[in-house]
Amino acid sequence: MSPIYTTLTLHLATALFLFFHVQKLVHYLHGKATGHRCRRLPPGPTGWPILGALPLLGNMPHVTFANMAKKYGSVMYLKVGSHGLAIASTPDAAKAFLKTLDLNFSNRPPNAGATHLAYNAQDMVFAHYGPKWKLLRKLSNLHMLGGKALENWADVRKTELGYMLKAMFESSQNNEPVMISEMLTYAMANMLSQVILSRRVFNKKGAKSNEFKDMVVELMTSAGYFNIGDFIPSIGWMDLQGIEGGMKRLHKKFDVLLTRLLDDHKRTSQERKQKPDFLDFVIANGDNSDGERLNTDNIKALLLNLFTAGTDTSSSIIEWALAELLKNRTLLTRAQDEMDRVIGRDRRLLESDIPNLPYLQAICKETFRKHPSTPLNLPRNCIRGHVDVNGYYIPKGTRLNVNIWAIGRDPSVWGDNPNEFDPERFLYGRNAKIDPRGNHFELIPFGAGRRICAGTRMGILLVEYILGTLVHSFDWKLGFSEDELNMDETFGLALQKAVPLAAMVIPRLPLHVYAP
């Protein structure tokens, strides 16, 4: 061996020895200073080199994580690519992250969906927790999503639901099945556009409304994927799964639509001086005392949030609820009996009837439990130092997903039949007081804490009102036996039915009810 090689080897060995021990000393001193001398990460699977746990997730990550939690516990830690990922799978674990440590997990991690679909995270969903996000949230609550704002557009909901009933009645007269997801998307898009833009975006259900529905579903599906580039940024440019390319193409379609809507709206602003709509308020009040100002991308990104999340999440919940009722007809009959007693059969269900319909509310809660629209909630990021959760150490920069789907199937919360659709579980005892608005961590379909879904009130109202109206107004019939009804899921940001629901409807109220 040459002297040069021997010297080089000794130098390398010495450098490695010093580096290793200095690193240990730094970690020890930092731990002593911060109180984290015993840094015990939550348990979790080992994963693969470089890829970490990515290959373990499969097509249904929420189910995979739920199964992992049975082995590793309520809080898990996985290395996914170059990032740490914490998974909370029980109500107590969710509460620790989303309430006790809410501020520390108030940001979203960067991801391809935020970059390519949400105008580089300029929207209300993915924006950094700060003044601009607060301004978007404030305007949305004040003029569209808050309690008072919802009251102001109650007539819009009633009118658009009337159009939907008329279309379904016509389908029944023509002996045609109703495609539930298409009908719901069409109605909800027009409800929202009346409030946002003072006009219906679709004058009739057809190719354009179906294309919009397909775009919304594609967005919600692709935004929920575990994209390799998000977890291994160094190879993100390769787009190995083709996800980012699809996002870019979809964004162009949405941008054309949103730009046209925004330009048309600006041209007609004088017509609404006496009665401004939501978009007028946003444009006129798009700044705050902190000097934040909403630009065009912020406004288009906000519209994208409202139209996509506002139509897809609520419509998917209603579709799941109807599917469960058609699979369990005794539940459908019980719901109709309750409505006939409270409302009668001479008029439509009104929003004011809902507090007097506990079984309807229980059906909605049970659907939120079993089929949450966002099964893994939206990801969050640990932004302020290192934290302890349930005795475990969570490093700064760790990503967080709360497995809402797993919480809804926790036997310690829901008993021995968590996979059974049983609205009665919400009628009696402790569960009767559970509310899905983010304060009871057994049922958090909209999330909780600062980043809870801004449309929580609207989502609950739309689900209860529309589902109740459909159940009260029609009898329902499948073209096959209930046992053949497909109840498989398709994973995404929202949990879709793998096979869309189609059914025949039979009017059960007087003819005048079906006139808008």
Curated annotation (Swiss-Prot):
Reaction(s) catalysed by this chain, per the record, are: a 3',5'-unsubstituted flavanone + 2 reduced [NADPH--hemoprotein reductase] + 2 O2 = a 3',5'-dihydroxyflavanone + 2 oxidized [NADPH--hemoprotein reductase] + 2 H2O + 2 H(+)
What Gene3D superfamilies does the database record attribute to this sequence? Cytochrome P450
Entry keyword Oxidoreductase? yes
User: What are the recorded Gene Ontology BP terms?
Assistant: anthocyanin-containing compound biosynthetic process
Q: Does the keyword Secreted apply?
A: no
As one GO molecular function, the record gives:
iron ion binding
* Annotated heme binding sites: C453
User: What Pfam families has UniProt attached to this entry?
Assistant: p450
The EC number of this protein is: 1.14.14.81
Leader sequence residues: none
Please give the PROSITE patterns that the UniProt record associates with this protein.
CYTOCHROME_P450 (PS00086)
Q: Which cofactor does it need?
A: heme
Q: Which UniProt keywords apply?
A: Heme, Iron, Metal-binding, Monooxygenase, NADP, Oxidoreductase
Pathway where it operates: Pigment biosynthesis; anthocyanin biosynthesis
Q: Cross-referenced PANTHER family, in alphabetical order?
A: CYTOCHROME P450 98A9 (PTHR47944), FLAVONOID 3'-MONOOXYGENASE (PTHR47944:SF18)
Say which family it is in: Belongs to the cytochrome P450 family.
UniProt function note: Catalyzes the 3'5'-hydroxylation of naringenin and eriodictyol to form 5,7,3,'4',5'-pentahydroxyflavanone and 3',5'-hydroxylation of dihydrokaempferol and dihydroquercetin to form dihydromyricetin.
State what protein this is by name: Flavonoid 3',5'-hydroxylase
Task: Tell me the organism.
Answer: Gentiana triflora (Clustered gentian)
